[in-house]
Every structure is written in C-alpha cells, then in structure tokens.
C-alpha cells in the first residue's frame, strides 16, 4: 500500500506539482490548491493478501471538493473504469449503464464491513438482518471501489457500507452518478 501510494504521489507531483493530495496511507498533503487527488492505492487489501482477485487502485480528482475525474483499475480482472463528470462512465472503453430496477425486492445489492469489525460497534451486521428479507440478494466483494464499479455497470443494483473514507468512494461515486 505505502510504496504504491508513494509512487502515485511522486508521479502526480511531477505532473501536477501544485495539486493537493489525500492518500489512505499518508493522509493529506496540502499545497493550497483547488485541485486534490484522492488516492486509495489498494482497495481490497485483505482480498489481495489472500490471493483473491477483487482489489483495485482507485483515484479521484476533486476541484473545490467536487469530484471531476474518477479512475478505478482492477488489475487481476483487467478492468479499467473511467469517468469525467458529466461524460458518462466506461469499463475498458465501453459505456456503462446503471440498473433500471426500481423494486428493492428484485434488487441484488452489495455491502461491506469495516476492517476493524471485531472492535467497531458500528459493523453493519444488524443492518443485514433487516435488509436481507427485503432484497433478492446481498453480496460482499471486499472492495468498496469495486462494488461501486459494479453498480455503475448495472451488475449490482445498489451498495451500502458504513464508516467509509473519501479515498474508498471518491472515484466510485462519480462512476455511479
């Protein structure tokens, strides 16, 4: 995680030396810019460490705290998700469309749990008990960024999770919008 984030920061500093950066591993690096790169170098760390294929690199660019560009790359799956605000979302160059389902009972949705679920009292388990009977199914992928990509592509009808940080969802939310 740390080496990957440092690489991103080094490259962004070369090309955009005045831009702010927010990274999962190193926090905020403020330079007083209206632009801020939001970086999650490895979303789905547990999946990666266990040899599971769902993990991503997620990067968003914000202008005055509004996300204007989002990029999520799932390297093992060779899926590149890209979006520019107002121009649609794409997977490997193919335009994406969110699901058109309007009934919760027909929906397959995803969720997640915080990495510290054993000590975090707000760990989402109680919500699943209430929601499961109302939906067609619930999935847990292990990467918030990838879950949002699946919503953007219409593979999932929705997604919720508690206690997320900006780097977890910055690019993915714009893909869905």
Give, region by region, the residue ranges found by the protein language model.
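N-terminal subdomain of lithium-sensitive/metallo-dependent phosphomonoesterases centered on the IMPase/IPPase/PAP
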Residues: 1-42
């Amino acid at each position: 995680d740390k080496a990957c984030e440092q690489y991103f920061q080094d490259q962004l500093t070369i090309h955009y030396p005045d831009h702010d950066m927010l990274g999962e591993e190193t926090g905020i690096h403020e330079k007083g810019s209206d632009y801020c790169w939001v970086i999650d170098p490895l979303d789905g760390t547990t999946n990666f460490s266990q040899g599971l294929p769902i993990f991503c690199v997620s990067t968003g660019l914000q202008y005055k705290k509004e996300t204007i560009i989002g990029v999520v790359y799932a390297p093992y799956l060779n899926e590149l998700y890209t979006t520019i605000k107002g121009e649609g979302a794409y997977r490997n160059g193919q335009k994406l469309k969110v699901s058109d389902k309007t009934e919760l009972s027909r929906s397959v949705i995803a969720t997640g749990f915080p990495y510290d679920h054993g000590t975090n009292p707000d760990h989402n388990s109680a919500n699943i008990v209430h929601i499961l009977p109302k939906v067609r199914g619930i999935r847990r992928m292990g990467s918030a960024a990838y879950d949002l990509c699946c919503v953007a592509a219409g593979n999932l009808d929705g997604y919720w999770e508690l206690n997320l940080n900006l780097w977890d969802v910055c690019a993915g939310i714009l893909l869905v919008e």
